[in-house]
């Protein structure tokens, strides 16, 4: 810490200012403000970050000492002001906690009550927020014995004012000889770290990571130091080198990583104006600019900054894991000498952990760099890798070069890992953490820490990829068969499961380079397969899966699956039942690995429907597709059979059907048609809107709630309906709109409740929805079509210009309106209002919300039930949608019209 820094704080000048005024408060406030401005300016100039946070601690020392000395403590008073915790280490960020201990020899606090209260009141008045405790030596010992946080705080302390001997005595009464011996302290800190990591989903790769508490964050480094200090009296990171816990190169990496996180944390506090340790979306871009990152052709500045962040914390996590393992071996020694199990000439198991038989193993046999992970997969009961062996792995990564990658023995070992029945994900994750995976597959190395700046992809590309492989492995678990029945059944039947793991490894590997990542990944996958000498048929399947890994999800979510042509087109691209099985399983794992909240019962139902319809098409033969007329005939016959069995007059049903048109029978199942028909025939003509509600399937983890509305058509029908559903907290995922020749509308909406699930068997909720819709449709003029609700913070940050595409369908007499826009509360209601203003009729809609963006497709006609044909009308429609959905700060993006 500096002895004096007059630019930051000049004690003489400060004392002179105090003498000029009756109240000390203005002078203290001015000093605090000026110090913050000086330090912030130095930060923006790029000054050394360690010096900055130490300078701030020094400055606060001066302020506190001067404030303390304003009060009468008497010369021989046994009371001291002690800095503890991070402040005790001499580290302070702009809004870090200033933790103080007012320490007394005796237990009688009353003696010093008046000056203590005056001192703390002064700190409050000048705006210096501190965390304080007032304790005697005996109370310190008692509190420290009972509370891990207290003993940890007291281990790092400095005397700010008062006699130093009090702090030294406190150190004695709370020493490891008196309480919290190193073994107990280590076990408690290890459990504390596990609990903390679990709060952040055990990943370094959260979208808005906490630079202090997340895995690989500053707290992990501090935890190492606390344990080392308790056991060995270590005072700083570099001392761990001399004690044999870190190599000099590891210390250098850890110290530079710590300084990077300090810069990020300082910037966070400075920009947020508060103690903010979360890398919030709305600050990530600003920090990227502040730290000098710029956009490139392939990556945004914020993506480059966050990739650096993720790689730094991954490196910290790797090193802290190594040192933790080292601590465990030293502090918790097992019966190492008597529990050695040789595996081969290169490896043995000691006390449950894998290790090399001698330090030269990797140098003599480089293939052992891969063999170690194959052994771990074969022996899942092995608890991990010993610290010295982890270090040797890290030190010998350089041996993995092009010759190593081409060696048939090494390629065979890598493929063997994917054929393991257990431990594939766990050992790939280990390989990634130890830097082996990115070294063996340089293309994978490029995606390590690669984020995508959106809410759709909540993991970095490498974390997402490994999560996908974990999801594939979990599909073998019997307990997941209920949630993923079809995927669990299919993965058991796949002839070569290792091929889907390899496709999963490569499916997103082309991201971050610009261009089509599916095509880039397919090229990389082909090169991988050829280098690993995979059979031509296996290579063809892997490359096809990588190239088409988005095909099934985009078809299910964006196309009308009731259209036979959609199924035929998809089946033509798949062409083979085995390919369909692999693609379905990969798609399920991919969606769940992208963002678990994206997987809902409706998406599950859509994918099953697409799989089943395609399976039938492939069995029937692609040269014999079912025509529209044949499908309508079959659907009507099946529906009529159901109705006759329930006692409905077939003549009444067929008379009603003549008013509905072909699309109705293409877009509904026979059971739904029977359900609609029976209810309509029984509904009195003067009974107002008919609203039917039921589940789309009885499968527990699939489907959604289906709302069918039959009512006289009215101009604002869609706008009022979606606004009412918005007010009822329903999210619409699909809409099918039919208008009969008798001018009745038959609308079906597929909805999920606010929690992402279907309504289920909830009579009260069903009645609330039915009443709300009937009331809105009976009194449309009184119903607000636009509901103003607060936009969530994260959505606000991801504003972008809406994209509106208008084109006529080549196969059907409708216009396709595609909208990509930021998600906002009430968005569909706004679109419905625009349709109303432009006199458009909605025929069908596919609604998809992907993180912070919606990608909706609407099939519309004009007032005469014809496709849109007026370019000027389309241009005005396009502009109206873009203006209505645009964020206030975003521009209107030019979009395409093709009519």
Curated annotation (Swiss-Prot):
Keyword Transcription regulation appears in the UniProt entry: no
GO biological process terms on file: nitrogen fixation; regulation of nitrogen utilization
CDD domains reported for this sequence: ACT_ACR-UUR-like_2, ACT_UUR-like_1, HDc, NT_GlnE_GlnD_like
Region spans: Uridylyl-removing: 343-705
Disruption phenotype: Cells lacking this gene are not viable unless a second mutation occurs, either spontaneously or by design, resulting in the inability of glutamine synthetase (GS) to be adenylylated.
Domain ACT: 706-789, 816-899
Cofactor(s) the record lists: Mg(2+)
EC number: 2.7.7.59, 3.1.4.-
Region (Uridylyltransferase): 1-342
Domain HD: 461-583
Sorted UniProt keywords: Hydrolase, Magnesium, Multifunctional enzyme, Nitrogen fixation, Nucleotidyltransferase, Repeat, Transferase
Keyword Nucleotidyltransferase: yes
Molecular function via GO: [protein-PII] uridylyltransferase activity; phosphoric diester hydrolase activity
Activity control: Uridylyltransferase (UTase) activity is inhibited by glutamine, while glutamine activates uridylyl-removing (UR) activity.
InterPro entries: ACT-like_dom_sf, ACT_dom, HD/PDEase_dom, HD_domain, NT_sf, PII_UdlTrfase/GS_AdlTrfase, Polymerase_NTP_transf_dom, UTase/UR
SMART domains for the chain: HDc
Function: Modifies, by uridylylation and deuridylylation, the PII regulatory protein GlnK, in response to the nitrogen status of the cell that GlnD senses through the glutamine level. Under low glutamine levels, catalyzes the conversion of the PII protein and UTP to PII-UMP and PPi, while under higher glutamine levels, GlnD hydrolyzes PII-UMP to PII and UMP (deuridylylation). Thus, controls uridylylation state and activity of the PII protein, and plays an important role in the regulation of nitrogen fixation and metabolism.
Comment block on domains: Has four distinct domains: an N-terminal nucleotidyltransferase (NT) domain responsible for UTase activity, a central HD domain that encodes UR activity, and two C-terminal ACT domains that seem to have a role in glutamine sensing.
Family: Belongs to the GlnD family.
UniProt name for this protein: Bifunctional uridylyltransferase/uridylyl-removing enzyme
Gene encoding the protein: glnD
């Amino acid at each position: 810490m500096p002895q004096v820094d007059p630019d930051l704080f000049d004690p003489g000048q400060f004392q002179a200012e105090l003498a000029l005024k009756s109240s000390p408060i203005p002078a203290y406030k001015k000093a605090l403000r000026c110090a913050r401005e000086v330090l912030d300016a130095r930060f923006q100039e790029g000054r050394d970050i360690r010096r900055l946070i130490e300078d701030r601690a020094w400055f606060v020392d001066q302020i506190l000492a001067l404030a303390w000395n304003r009060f009468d403590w008497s010369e021989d008073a046994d009371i001291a002001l002690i800095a503890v915790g991070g402040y005790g280490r001499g580290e302070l960020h702009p809004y870090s906690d200033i933790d103080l201990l007012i320490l007394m020899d005796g237990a009688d606090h009353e003696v010093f009550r008046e000056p203590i209260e005056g001192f703390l009141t002064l700190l409050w008045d000048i705006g210096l927020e501190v965390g304080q405790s007032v304790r005697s030596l005996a109370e310190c010992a008692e509190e420290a014995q009972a509370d891990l946080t207290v003993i940890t705080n007291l281990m790092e302390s400095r005397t700010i004012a008062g006699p130093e001997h009090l702090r030294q005595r406190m150190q004695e009464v709370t020493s490891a000889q008196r309480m919290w011996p190193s073994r107990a302290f280590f076990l408690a800190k290890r459990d504390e770290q596990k609990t903390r990591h679990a709060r952040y989903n055990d990943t370094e790769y959260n979208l808005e990571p906490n630079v202090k508490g997340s895995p690989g964050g500053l707290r992990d480094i501090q935890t190492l130091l606390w344990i080392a200090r308790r056991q060995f009296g270590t005072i700083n990171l570099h001392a761990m080198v001399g004690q044999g816990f870190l190599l000099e190169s590891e210390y250098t990496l850890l110290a530079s990583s710590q300084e990077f996180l300090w810069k990020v944390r300082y910037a966070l506090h400075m920009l947020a104006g508060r103690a903010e340790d979360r890398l919030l979306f709305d600050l990530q871009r600003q920090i990227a600019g502040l730290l000098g990152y710029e956009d490139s052709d392939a990556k945004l500045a914020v993506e480059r900054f966050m990739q650096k962040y993720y790689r730094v914390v991954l490196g910290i996590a790797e090193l802290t894991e190594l040192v933790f393992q080292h601590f465990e071996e030293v502090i918790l020694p097992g019966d190492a000498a008597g529990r050695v199990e040789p595996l081969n000439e290169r490896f043995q198991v000691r006390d449950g952990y894998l290790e090399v038989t001698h330090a030269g193993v990797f140098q003599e046999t480089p293939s052992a760099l891969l063999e170690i992970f194959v052994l771990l997969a074969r022996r899942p009961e092995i608890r991990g890798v010993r610290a010295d062996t982890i270090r040797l792995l890290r030190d010998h990564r350089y041996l993995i070069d092009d010759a190593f990658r081409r060696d048939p023995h090494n390629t065979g070992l890598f493929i063997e890992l994917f054929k393991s029945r257990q431990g594939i994900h766990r050992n790939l994750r280990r390989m990634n953490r130890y830097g082996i995976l990115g070294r063996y597959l340089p293309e994978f190395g490029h995606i390590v820490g690669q984020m995508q700046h959106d809410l759709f992809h909540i993991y970095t590309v490498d974390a997402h990829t490994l999560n996908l492989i974990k999801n594939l492995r979990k599909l073998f678990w019997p307990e997941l068969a209920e949630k993923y029945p079809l995927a669990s059944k299919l993965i058991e039947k796949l002839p070569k499961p290792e091929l889907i793991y390899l496709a999963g490894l490569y499916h997103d590997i082309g991201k971050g380079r610009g261009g089509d990542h599916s095509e880039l990944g397919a090229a990389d996958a082909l090169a991988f397969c050829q280098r690993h000498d995979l059979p031509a048929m296996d290579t063809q399947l892997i490359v096809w899966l990588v190239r088409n890994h988005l095909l099934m999800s985009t078809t299910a979510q964006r196309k009308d699956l009731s259209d036979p042509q959609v199924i035929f087109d998809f089946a033509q691209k798949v062409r083979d039942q085995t390919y369909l099985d692999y693609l379905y399983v990969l798609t399920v794992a991919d969606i769940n690995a992208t963002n678990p909240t994206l997987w809902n019962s409706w998406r599950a139902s859509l994918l099953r429907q697409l799989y089943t319809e395609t399976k039938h098409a492939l069995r029937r033969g692609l040269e014999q597709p079912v025509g529209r007329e044949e499908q309508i005939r079959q659907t009507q016959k099946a529906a009529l059979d159901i109705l006759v069995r329930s006692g409905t007059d077939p003549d009444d049903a067929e008379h009603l059907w003549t008013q509905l048109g072909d699309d109705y029978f293409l877009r509904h199942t026979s059971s739904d048609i029977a359900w609609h028909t029976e209810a309509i025939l029984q509904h009195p003509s003067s009974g107002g809107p008919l609203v039917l509600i039921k589940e789309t399937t009885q499968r527990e983890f699939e489907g959604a709630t289906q709302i069918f509305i039959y009512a006289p058509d009215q101009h604002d029908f869609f706008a009022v309906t979606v606004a009412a559903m918005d007010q009822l907290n329903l999210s619409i995922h699909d809409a099918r709109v039919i208008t009969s020749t008798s001018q009745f509308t038959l609308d079906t909406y597929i909805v999920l409740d606010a929690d992402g699930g279907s309504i289920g068997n909830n009579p009260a909720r069903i009645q609330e929805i039915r009443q709300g819709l009937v009331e809105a449709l009976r009194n449309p003029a009184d119903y607000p079509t636009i509901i103003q609700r607060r936009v969530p913070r994260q959505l606000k940050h991801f504003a972008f210009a809406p994209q509106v595409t208008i084109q006529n369908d080549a196969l059907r007499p409708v216009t396709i309106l595609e909208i990509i826009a930021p998600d906002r509360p009430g968005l569909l209601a706004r679109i419905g209002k625009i349709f109303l203003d432009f006199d458009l009729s909605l025929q069908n809609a596919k609604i998809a919300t992907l993180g912070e963006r919606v990608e909706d497709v609407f099939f519309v006609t004009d007032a005469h039930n014809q496709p849109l044909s007026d370019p000027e009308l389309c241009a005005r429609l396009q502009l109206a949608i873009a203006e209505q959905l645009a964020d206030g700060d975003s521009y209107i993006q030019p979009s395409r019209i093709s009519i």
